[in-house]
Amino acid sequence: MKLIPAALIAATLATPAAALEPLSQEKYINDRLIAARIADRIRRTCPSIDGRILYAYGEARKLKRYAESKGYSRAEIDAFLDSRPDKQRIYAVAEDYLTRQGAKAAEPESFCRIGRQEIARNTVIGSLLVAK
């Protein structure tokens, strides 16, 4: 009888910890980074919308703490944030979203319209923006 608990403990200790998925595949983190990129494009293109910079900074710190709480190291987080392919992927997804919403590079008002909609719907994107 005492062998069974000992065997279970030994088996548990011998089992490797569950491997974390790559940060590039972590949905919550990627969705927030994509939203931040979209908000940044809107605030830089639309003259009547600003970014909530201090709020965005706080959200970025929360996101980093979230990643750390999931078990990612600071080195892994920094490597992900510095990764050119991951940045390009995030930027591409953000641009695709803006295009599907009707954004046109030559029409700043198209970005303003999207920004106002995001603010009105209180989306993650909208929470990072404020109308001037």
Curated annotation (Swiss-Prot):
The organism's place on the tree of life at top rank: Bacteria
InterPro entries: Uncharacterised_14.7kDa
Name this polypeptide is given: Uncharacterized 14.7 kDa protein in nqo3 5'region
